[in-house]
């Protein structure tokens, strides 16, 4: 089941012989409280979370789960990617042609692929695919994490199906569209984290669920002045949280 993917008790503080236990911008992903009830994990996770000295999450779904489990409110922070400047680690690219970056899980529908191809052709953009291979769509880039950041920063446009694809787009002030996958039943969805992030920066219009919205969304202007102001305030809040809790170790 998708809700069990990547699960490890150690991620929730189990068997950690630490003086102080804290989380920073953690997330349950698409897992909801009712999933934990169905899987029989609520009692165990409640016990784990009550042992934390400080709890921080990155989305309201996770915040709600922690509160349902423990009765306690957690801090609410942006993804850690926003909190660090990676510039000195990012290589300079020798890629000369303007490109459309597709940062997505494998298996984009043929309808989305066709729309993306037409958009790229209309704007004379090369299509470069990152993260997941897209059969018949552009060039797949098998690169290092810091090379990826350089490519995201230099992209003309970004299309993504992921939370972190949207994070990179915001961090580097890109014109982008985020394809949302609404969860059905106990299957996978990306709207818990993705929708929460875009709502926070008032960019819900960049989230689409139909191929015909790609062109309009990629061409829409984004006021990054207000977005960056909000992100900078949240980053400061996150750093203050970290500093305050690190002091407790002294």
What are these regions (language model features)?
Residues 1-250:
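Active-site anion-handling motifs in enzyme catalytic cores
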């Amino acid at each position: 089941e998708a809700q069990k993917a990547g699960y490890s008790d150690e991620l929730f503080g189990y068997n950690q012989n630490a003086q102080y236990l804290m989380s920073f911008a953690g997330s349950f992903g698409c897992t909801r409280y009712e999933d934990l009830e169905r899987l029989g994990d609520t009692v165990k996770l409640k016990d784990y979370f009550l042992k934390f000295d400080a709890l921080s999450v990155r989305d309201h779904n996770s915040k709600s789960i922690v509160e349902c489990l423990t009765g306690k409110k957690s801090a609410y922070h942006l993804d850690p990617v926003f909190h660090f400047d990676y510039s000195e680690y990012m290589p300079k690219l020798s890629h000369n042609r303007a490109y459309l970056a597709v940062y997505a899980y494998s298996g984009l529908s043929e309808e989305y692929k066709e729309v993306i191809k037409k958009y790229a052709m209309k704007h004379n953009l090369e299509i470069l695919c990152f993260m997941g291979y897209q059969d018949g769509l552009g060039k797949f880039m098998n690169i290092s994490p810091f090379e990826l950041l350089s490519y995201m920063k230099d992209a003309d446009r970004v299309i993504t199906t992921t939370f972190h694809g949207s994070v990179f787009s915001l961090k580097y002030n890109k014109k982008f569209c985020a394809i949302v996958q609404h969860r059905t039943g106990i299957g996978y969805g990306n709207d818990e984290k993705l929708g929460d992030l875009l709502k926070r920066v008032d960019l819900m219009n960049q989230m689409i669920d139909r191929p015909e919205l790609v062109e309009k969304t990629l061409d829409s202007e984004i006021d990054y002045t207000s977005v960056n102001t909000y992100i900078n305030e949240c980053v400061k809040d996150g750093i203050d949280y970290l500093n305050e809790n690190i002091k407790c170790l002294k």
